[in-house]
Amino acid sequence: MDNNMTDIDKVVESRAIERILSDYAYFLDMNMPEEMVKLFVDDCEVSYGPKFGARGIADYAKTLDGIGTFFKGTSHHNSGTVIDFVSPTEAVTRTIVLAVHRYAKDAPDGILYGQYHDRLVKVDGAWKFKARELRTTMTTDYHVRSFNPIGRRD
């Protein structure tokens, strides 16, 4: 990919992208949905599963309604992030996620193992999510029953 970026540019922009990935997890774990929304562009697309997602920032904000009362707490752990620059203002990423969910109701903690596949764009000097897809490898005692597959070969 010829994206006209120096190696130094790639390092600097990679750190900025890693920051937004970490901020997403932090804001989710801290029950700060209003901060999560700021990480997305207005015409974003989000898919957490085949029947759960959003098109556009207003629709995305609705998906976050009630997270503070549904969960007592969450702990999202990102690792293995890979960043490929399409251009100086667009990148695609893949990040491994382990997410533990403590429910408000009396239930065992739910655990999700999966991957985030993202498209990010740089708008007014800041990286934002254009598209975010959660692909699920497996779960334990998790509340969602329908998932986007990771695409693993048989």
Task: For every predicted segment, state its role.
Residues M1-Y26, M30, E34, K38, ...:
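Short, low-complexity N-terminal intrinsically disordered segments enriched in polar/charged residues
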Residues D2-M5, T69-D154:
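A beta-strand edge to alpha-helix "cap/lid" segment located at domain peripheries
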Residues N3-T6, E18, D42, V46, ...:
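Generic, low-specificity signal for short hydrophobic/alpha-helical stretches with a mild N-terminal bias
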Residues P33-L98:
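A solvent-exposed, acidic/Ser-Thr-rich amphipathic alpha-helical stretch
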